[in-house]
Amino acid sequence: MSKFAEPMARLIDELKKLPGVGNKSAQRLAFHILRSSNDDAELLADAVRDVKAKLRLCSICNNITDVDPCTYCANPTRNQQVICVVEEPTNISAVEKTRHFNGVYHVLHGALSPLHGVGPEHLRISNLIKRVEGGKAEEVILATNPTVEGEATATYLSKILKAEGVRVTRIATGVPVGSDIEYADEVTMQKAMEGRREL
């Protein structure tokens, strides 16, 4: 028997499905929502519905967007010849914070992880290859996370992309190994971008 009423137990169970939210955090969030005004609870519910209804993936780079193509791909002042490959859409803001990158992005939506059953077919690689085919790109910067999975992904992509004749670089290890670039500060990310190397 649950120690909470069924609607509260259900909300806690749903909140626990969010990344980084354990049982205690889910309980705190659920009770915060319960104490909130009905208007605030409705605003939260509307925001969740809007995200699901109005956001989609950019048809070019796979970034999450409400317009297609996204603002990066549609911006004529950005260098379309330089593509920065990241694992997740949240990684883009880490690169943008440096104010030293004016190219475009490609979001893989993950990294290779054989232990977790994530192979190349689970990532958004095929449209990256189409973007570089026939000399459409001068350089591809592999800005995957400095983890075992991120390094494996970078190595895999490097082999494929070099066969297309494009320059392939990897961000420098100014970003600590085992971390997520989403949490890198501007200076660290800037140094990582400046110190990228050929693969």
From Swiss-Prot:
Keywords: DNA damage, DNA recombination, DNA repair, Metal-binding, Zinc, Zinc-finger. Gene3D superfamilies: 3.30.60.80, 3.40.1360.10, 6.10.250.240, RecR Domain 1. One of its GO terms (molecular function) is zinc ion binding. PROSITE patterns: TOPRIM. Residues 81-176 form the Toprim domain. GO terms for biological process: DNA recombination; DNA repair. A zinc finger (C4-type) spans 58-73. The keyword Translocase does not apply. InterPro entries: DNA_Rcmb_RecR, Rcmb_RecR, Rcmb_RecR_Znf, TOPRIM_dom, TOPRIM_RecR. Pfam families: RecR_C, RecR_HhH, RecR_ZnF, Toprim_4. May play a role in DNA repair. It seems to be involved in an RecBC-independent recombinational process of DNA repair. It may act with RecF and RecO. This is Recombination protein RecR. It comes from Koribacter versatilis (strain Ellin345). The lineage of its organism: Bacteria, Pseudomonadati, Acidobacteriota, Terriglobia, Terriglobales. The gene is recR.
